[in-house]
Regions:
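Helix-biased detector of long, well-ordered alpha-helical tracts
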Residues: 1-174
């Protein structure tokens, strides 16, 4: 972590050609590419079950990346953004419940914190994206660094809909 994004490849598998979906996807991809100043340099398109794979490439100075294995006892843990909104949106969709507009944006237009990753390069002892969830991804850092952690659930940055869901269900699995 901590590098500068340069370019990416896209592998797209589609079950059928849906021109409206493809146009919306392409427009969003172009907007993101322009926002983060990265270019699509190649990839593949095939027919099959829906699968979208983006591989980002970048550069970083030698020996300056933020690794999973750098955490030390006594370090504080920080989370950027809010947790659970995209997962709650997907859960609602799968249950036939209409998600809010902000939940849809969290699911469909996640914001990678590329600039922050670069800015933390000489500050953070360890770093990871939490695309697999806080518990699972934090455990990667803890195992790699051979340390433990205490999480204070009342300090987690949750949007109101996620906070309400957790209070009502006591389900922290999002």
């Amino acid at each position: 972590m901590g590098g500068v994004a340069k370019c990416y490849t896209l592998s797209l598998t589609l079950p059928k050609l849906d021109k409206d979906w493809l146009e919306q996807f392409s427009t969003s991809l172009k907007e993101s590419s322009e926002r983060f100043r990265v270019n699509l340099i190649g990839g593949d398109t095939t027919r099959g079950p829906l699968n979208i794979t983006i591989s980002m490439m970048g550069s970083i100075e030698i020996n300056s990346s933020i690794k999973r294995s750098g955490a030390r006892a006594g370090d504080d843990i920080y989370v950027t953004g809010s947790l659970g909104a995209a997962a709650l949106c997907l859960k609602k969709i799968n249950e036939g419940v209409k998600p809010s507009e902000s939940e849809l944006i969290s699911l469909n237009k996640p914001i990678p914190r590329l600039e922050l990753g670069s800015a933390l390069r000489n500050i953070a002892s360890s770093c990871i994206d939490i695309s697999d969830g806080l518990e699972q991804d934090l455990s990667h850092i803890l195992k790699s660094s051979n340390v433990g952690a205490i999480i204070y659930s009342d300090k987690l940055p949750l949007v109101n809909s996620v906070s309400n869901y957790v209070k009502d269900s006591n389900d922290w699995s999002l």
